Each structure stands twice: as structure tokens, then as C-alpha cells.
UniProtKB/Swiss-Prot annotation:
ATP binds at S29, G30, G31, P32, D33, S34. The lineage of its organism: Bacteria, Bacillati, Bacillota, Bacilli, Bacillales. PANTHER family: TRNA(ILE)-LYSIDINE SYNTHASE-RELATED (PTHR43033:SF1). One of its GO terms (cellular component) is cytoplasm. CDD domains: PRTases_typeI, TilS_N. This is Bifunctional protein TilS/HprT. Its cofactor is Mg(2+). Ligates lysine onto the cytidine present at position 34 of the AUA codon-specific tRNA(Ile) that contains the anticodon CAU, in an ATP-dependent manner. Cytidine is converted to lysidine, thus changing the amino acid specificity of the tRNA from methionine to isoleucine.
Length: 648
């Protein structure tokens, strides 16, 4: 075994490229590089010979394409190697795809390789990239301004559909490959396009590589080390970036939202890496066209003092900054749809944002306006009311203030994203006086209830049901889905140790504890029994009433049993204190409490859980079983609800 063979074997072992039970598909063009790789693998004994086959794609781009195909067929037939050949008119395909020749050739080539691998149950694709290719690639990406993920160049292996692409020849040079081919008397075709200065790579090969080798003959090993160290750095930052995105990313139908409150405080290198990781996710890993400029544009938008801005990214991806959120969505920018409605007394209109507005005479009983209602003195306005978009120059007379204020300034003060402002309903009377922008601001025409005056009441009702609006109602993701599951695994291990051999009765407190209990008990590896109890002191409100009611009692007796109570959150503690005392009164052998969340700031009675998942701040939290007005229980994470939702 000569030095070249030894280095390739060492590289294969170092990067775990080939195992004895692998099946290899060798991509062979008919040139010296791929033919040498095939010869090396065929004679290496790394895998049995019957585990090796060949794929050749005839692009019909070069005059000697037929000769290249013939070289592959001849060699494979002489050695008894199975081979698969496909012919594609790449020029025609490029026109139909509206892509460049090189990009199209790569697409059809890998489609062919992956198809063969799937049909023949092959798990490794061997490619003949070498050390010269590596230097050229790194330099080209740096000069072009590629994102930093590309600085490490060609990787020893990468994932494909159903397998991996491997590059065993990366540690050896083009010259060494030619020597190998000549030594073994391999007949190959020379690609005449490799000498054309029309192609960028060829210019690097002809002009830069000779200079670098002349400056330092060890340039190959230096670039190899640079590639490996850069790749290691990338993987380390990638893991941190992935964790950062898990905590700050919401997938909401066609829109993906990055929460900026915490994200923008992270170090710049981590922000850049996270943005690139996010773009790769959005583009389904095909983000080769993403450059440093794209990433810096997004970072600048995040760090800018301008709270409302947007940029267009490749392939019709739009990034919209809306104060503390950055939205990504594919498609053309939405042109604001104009609307204009007349609202007569006792009428109700439906808006495109799934909200409705109703105008009625006030009833004889006292009514409060709230955030979703407004009382008007009939003598001060002219019907019908008008519900429309904002228009340039709109001004509102403010309650408790002298003079009027531009709607634009009101929206800025309220932090309404620019792209949302044209969608908001503006309610005026028939003479044009602006009365109300629901959810934003009421005018000076807002009145208190009067028994003596004729008054109208406007009701604005927003549908907060449904998946899309549900996520939009969340101010911040407090605990991600991954963090929840990691903590549940930890609690499961602790409870397994605690209750092994004791056959506890596990009591779930309905309804909120159901998701937590379901996931937790999957992680408790011992015999147990389950029961449920519904005990409440909240009703449909947001503040504990202090009165505890049993809505559903236990089916099983707790007498003499070890009881484990599972709850979603301990807030005031009244409900849990009552329940624990009740179970003790019923002569349980022991009672312990496990809660997913503990909110000490809300405590009104002395009670502590034996097992706690997370301590949370004094915020209105929902999701993963926790609700507001029976909504949001099905969120997969714990989030902080926007105040305007539970204040309505």
C-alpha cells in the first residue's frame, strides 16, 4: 500500500466514512478522479465487491459525453461491476426549470443518484472531490460572500435522502489522483471544459492554485486543517443556535415568527448563526444562495431602532419586523384590502379579520364599556356609523386631552406594526368624526353610562379561536416544547425511584393537568393506578374566587394508599391545599404533590410541592393544559398571554 492509499484509508477511518456492511454507489463521470476512486474502492476490501455499484449521468452537454459514458460502461463490464446509466437533456431541463445549467445539472444528478440508492437499497454515495476542489471551493465561497457555514468548504460526508454522500479522496491532490490513474493504467476521458476560463472554478484552478502552491507547498494540509476546525466551530455554534431558536421561534401556519425580546440580546455571532439556521429551515436546507449580505440585512433589521420594517429575500421569502417580533413568510407582499361599511342601528358587520362590530341602543341596566365596547351619546353623533380603513391625515380627538392626534402617531405609540395598520377598523360617525379604533384607542366621544340620556353601544368582538390567532395571542414563549419534555423525563426518573414497588394511586387534577400527566406517566417505569378529580376555585375568570368546589370526585378509595397528586400549576394554592387536606382526611398512607409550574408570587396559603418542574414569574401563563376561558390548553408550549387578551 503506497502513501496515497494509506492517507485515504486513514481519512476514511478518521471520519467513519465506510463500514464493512455499507453498500456503495460510486458516482463515475468517466474522468480520472471518479474512475480512480472506483478503482480504489473496488480493490480496497473496505466492503465486499458485491456491495459496490456505479451510477453515471449523461448530461448531453459536452461533445465527448458519449465517450465518457463508454469509458464507464467498458470499465464496469471488464470488472463485473453493476452500473446504472441515465441520459438527460440538461439544457432543455434548465429552460423548463428557469435555472442555470450548472445548478440544473446538479439537481438532476442528485435526483438520479438518490433514485438509484432508494431502488437498490444503497446507503452510501461515493464522490471523487479532492484537495484541489476543497481549496477552490473555500476561496470561491469567501470571495463570493457566502454565509459562514460555507467557509469550511466541502465536508467529508453529508446527509442525503435515505443515506450519505461521502468523499474519501478529499485528503489527496489532483496530481496524486492522476499519478494513481496512470500507475494503474486506467483509461479515462478528459473534460475539455476544465480548461475553459469561462467558468469561475477553472480561473481559480489555473491562476490561484499554482500561486498558492508556489508560496507554500503545504497549502493543502493547511486548508484541510482550516476546513476541519471551521467545521467544528460551526457545529458548536450550531447547537447553541438551535437551542436559541427553540426558545424563541413560533411556527404558525404559513408564517414563522422569531421573538426578538431575548434574541436580540444574544451575542452577534450567535444571532448570525441562528438566522442562517432559520433560513436553512425555511428553505428546506437548500440555502446555497443565501449570502452574508442577506444575514446582515436581517440582523440590522433586528437591531435597528425602527420597529417596523421589511426586506425581500430570495424565492419570495419576506421578512417583516413588527416591534418585538420578526415574521417570515413566503409569497408576494400583501396589498392592504380596502373596506368600507355602513353600520345602522341594530346592524352587525363581519370583518375580514374574523371580528364583528355591532351597534345597539344601550339597555336599561348598567353596562360597562370595557376594552371591547364603547358608549356614545346619541345627540353627539350622526348615524349611520362608518367602518373603514385608515386614510392619510386621519386625526382623533383624544379623551382627556386638548386637540387631536394623528392616527399614525397613535399607532406608533401603541406599537402597532406598520403592515398591520391598514387592516385595523376605524369607526367614524356619518360626518367623519373618528370615534374608535378597536383594540387601540377610544376618542373623546366615549361616554359613561347614563340613565337619562339616549345612548348607543358599539360592541367589537374578536374571534380568538383557531390555531393562527391562538399563537398570535402569545406575548412570549416562556418554556418551549423541548424544555417541557426534557424536564418531564427528569421528573419521570425521580418518581420511578420514589414509587418503585409501592403501586401508588396517581390523581390527576382536571382539566389542566391532563397533558402533563399523560406525558409524565409514560416516563414513570413502575406499576401504578390512575384516577382523576376536578376541583376548582376559579370558574371562568382569571382570579381565584376563594370558594373550592368538587366537580368530579375520585372513583377509587385512597385509604391506606400512597397518593401522588399531579397538577399543572400552583398559583394561589387554595385548590391544592383543599385537595391535599381532603385526601389526608380520607386516610391516605401518604400524599405527595408534583406540579409542572409553581408561581410563588400568587400564593395565598402555605403549600409546597414535593416535585416542581419550573418556577414561573407572576404572569398570565397558558398552554400545555393551562387555559384562559378554556382556550390555549392545546398549545404545545407554555406562553405568556398578551394582557389585552384577558383584559377584554
Amino acid at each position: 500500500m503506497d502513501d496515497t492509499d494509506k492517507r485515504v484509508h486513514k481519512y476514511i477511518e478518521k471520519h467513519d466514512l465506510i463500514r464493512s456492511d455499507d453498500k456503495l454507489l460510486v458516482a463515475v463521470s468517466g474522468g480520472p478522479d471518479s474512475l480512480a476512486l472506483l478503482h480504489f474502492l473496488w480493490n480496497s476490501n473496505l466492503v465486499p465487491k458485491e456491495a459496490i455499484s456505479v451510477a453515471h449521468l449523461n448530461h448531453h452537454l459536452r461533445e465527448n459525453a458519449a465517450n465518457e459514458q463508454n469509458v464507464v460502461e467498458t470499465f464496469c463490464e471488464s470488472q463485473g461491476i453493476p452500473f446504472y446509466i441515465e441520459e438527460v437533456d440538461v439544457k432543455s431541463r434548465a429552460e423548463s426549470l428557469q435555472k442555470g445549467i450548472e445548478e440544473t445539472a446538479r439537481i438532476v444528478r442528485y435526483d438520479f443518484f438518490e433514485k438509484v440508492m432508494a431502488e437498490k437499497k444503497i446507503n452510501k454515495l461515493a464522490l471523487a472531490h479532492h484537495a484541489d476542489d476543497q481549496i477552490e471551493t473555500i476561496l470561491m465561497r469567501l470571495v463570493r460572500g457566502s454565509a459562514s457555514i460555507g467557509w469550511s468548504g466541502i465536508q467529508p460526508k453529508r446527509e442525503l435522502k435515505g443515506g450519505q454522500a461521502i468523499r474519501p479522496f478529499l485528503p489527496i491532490t489532483k496530481a496524486e489522483i492522476i499519478d494513481y490513474a496512470q500507475k494503474h493504467e486506467l483509461a479515462y476521458e478528459i473534460d475539455e471544459s476544465n480548461t475553459s476560463q469561462e467558468y469561475t472554478r477553472n480561473r481559480y484552478r489555473a491562476q490561484l492554485l499554482p500561486f498558492l502552491k508556489q508560496e507554500n507547498p503545504a497549502v493543502y494540509s493547511h486548508f484541510e486543517r482550516f476546513s476541519e476546525e471551521t467545521s467544528e466551530d460551526f457545529q458548536f455554534l450550531e447547537a447553541l443556535a438551535s437551542d436559541l431558536l427553540k426558545k424563541n421561534l413560533i411556527k404558525n401556519g404559513k408564517r414563522t415568527t422569531l421573538l426578538l425580546t431575548n434574541f436580540k440580546n444574544e451575542a452577534n455571532p450567535l444571532q448570525r448563526r441562528a438566522i442562517h439556521l432559520l433560513l436553512r429551515y425555511l428553505y428546506n436546507e437548500d440555502a446555497s444562495f443565501i449570502t452574508v449580505n442577506h444575514i446582515y440585512q436581517i440582523i440590522q433589521m433586528i437591531q435597528s431602532d425602527n420597529p417596523s420594517s421589511s426586506i425581500d429575500l430570495p424565492n419570495k421569502l419576506v421578512a417583516n419586523r413588527a416591534y418585538d417580533k420578526l415574521h417570515f413568510q413566503f409569497g408576494e407582499r400583501e396589498a392592504p384590502s380596502e373596506f368600507y361599511h355602513q353600520l345602522e342601528l341594530n346592524d352587525r358587520i363581519e370583518l375580514d379579520n374574523k371580528a364583528s362590530i355591532r351597534l345597539k341602543l344601550k339597555s336599561s341596566v348598567v353596562q360597562t364599556n370595557g376594552l371591547n365596547g364603547m358608549l356614545l351619546d346619541a345627540e353627539e353623533i350622526t348615524l349611520p356609523l362608518i367602518v373603514r380603513n385608515r386614510v392619510n391625515g386621519d386625526r382623533m380627538t383624544m379623551k382627556g386631552q386638548a386637540g387631536s392626534k394623528k392616527l399614525k402617531d397613535i399607532f406608533i405609540d401603541a406599537k402597532i406594526p406598520r403592515q398591520e395598520r391598514d387592516k385595523l377598523p376605524v369607526i367614524t360617525d356619518y360626518t367623519g368624526k373618528i370615534l374608535w379604533v378597536p383594540g387601540v384607542k377610544k376618542s373623546a366621544y366615549d361616554r359613561e353610562f347614563s340613565r337619562s340620556k339616549k345612548q348607543y353601544i358599539i360592541r367589537y368582538t374578536r374571534n380568538i379561536g383557531g390555531n393562527e390567532s391562538m399563537h398570535n395571542d402569545i406575548q412570549k414563549v416562556l418554556i418551549s416544547e423541548d424544555e417541557l419534555q426534557e424536564k418531564i423525563r427528569e421528573l419521570g426518573r425521580e418518581l420511578t425511584t420514589e414509587y418503585e414497588g409501592r403501586n401508588p394511586l396517581v390523581v390527576g387534577v382536571l382539566k389542566g393537568a391532563t397533558p402533563f400527566m399523560t406525558d409524565l406517566l409514560k416516563r414513570v417505569d413502575t406499576y401504578l393506578e390512575m384516577d382523576f378529580m376536578d376541583v376548582s376555585s376559579y370558574g371562568n375568570g382569571t382570579v381565584s374566587s376563594g370558594e373550592v368546589k368538587i366537580i368530579k370526585d375520585l372513583n377509587a378509595s385512597v385509604e391506606g394508599r400512597d397518593v401522588l397528586v399531579i397538577e399543572d400549576i400552583i398559583d394561589s394554592g387554595r385548590t391544592l391545599s383543599y385537595l391535599v387536606d381532603l385526601i389526608k382526611y380520607r386516610k391516605a398512607k401518604s400524599v405527595k404533590l408534583v406540579t409542572l409550574l409553581d408561581k410563588p408570587a400568587g400564593r395565598n396559603v402555605e403549600i409546597e410541592a414535593d416535585y416542581v418542574g419550573f418556577v414561573v414569574p407572576n404572569e398570565f401563563v397558558v398552554g400545555y393544559g393551562l387555559d384562559y376561558a378554556e382556550r390555549y390548553r392545546n398549545l404545545p408550549y407554555i406562553g405568556i398571554l398578551k394582557p389585552e387578551i384577558y383584559s377584554e
